[in-house]
Amino acid sequence: MRPVYITRTSSFMPNDPVQNSEIEEYLGMIGGKPSRAKELILRNNQIKTRYYALDKSQNVTHSAFDMAVESIRSLYGDRINENTIDLLAAGTASQEMIMPSHGVQIHGQMGGERDMEVVSFAGSCCSGIHALKYCQMAVSSGERSRAVAVASERFSAWMRASFFNDEYESLSRLMEDPMIAFEKDFLRFMLSDGASAVLVTDKPNENGLSLKLEWVELTSYANTMPTCMYAGAQYEG
């Protein structure tokens, strides 16, 4: 097995940082009223600023694959570009189309002359790490030598007020029942947008830092634990 290194990292955040006081200017107010749970949620999550791929009229400014491509392009330089990468592994929990897959959308927007292996991963929280593990295994096996793992999310489009019914969980119930922490209002003040990418290679940098990647371990507990985050269905446990 060959050694594996992360030799470059990058990120892309859309637009300007959004202050907590501005959140509902971007997402809108459900029923035209400020959220009663907002301050409680923000006090507990301690998020101070975030980024949205939206303007204050709730118009989308970037797609998830736009942001992914920008983060990948930030890896370029010193013979690294869309024509020298031989594997693209992409992860997201907020894919914008059923088909084609997230990774293929990104590859199409990258352009270039290089045909390459592309894989896509989906799922809450860990899809980007799945992409990283795939790159690690491909480089370790000797099948690939320059791989990019990228993750991007655009949850703000899901969180716009226009997509929510005019219904609120009471503040007292939010404080009494921790499972309400996964309901609608909670997610509006937790999730935001952005992308990050890493270059995974079989050789360390000649100059600069490299991170040797020895293992990535992933374990699902879905067989014993209840679902905590879901989309696209009514979940009845």
Region spans (language model):
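Condensing-enzyme catalytic core mediating Claisen C-C bond formation in acyl metabolism
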Residues: 1-61, 174-237
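Short beta-strand segments
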Residues: 7-8, 91, 122, 147-153, ...
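Short acidic, glycine/serine/threonine-rich loops at helix termini
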Residues: 18, 99-101, 133, 158-163, ...
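Conserved catalytic cysteine-centered active-site region
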Residues: 38, 42-52, 60-65, 93-146
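Phosphate/pyrophosphate-binding loops at sites that engage ATP/ADP/AMP, CoA/4′-phosphopantetheine
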Residues: 71-86
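Short glycine-rich or small-residue beta-strand-to-loop segments that form or flank ligand, phosphate
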Residues: 86-94
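Acyl-CoA/ACP chain-elongation machinery
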Residues: 143-165, 221-228
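Short, flexible helix-coil linker/hinge segments at the edges of structured domains or between repeats
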Residues: 158-180
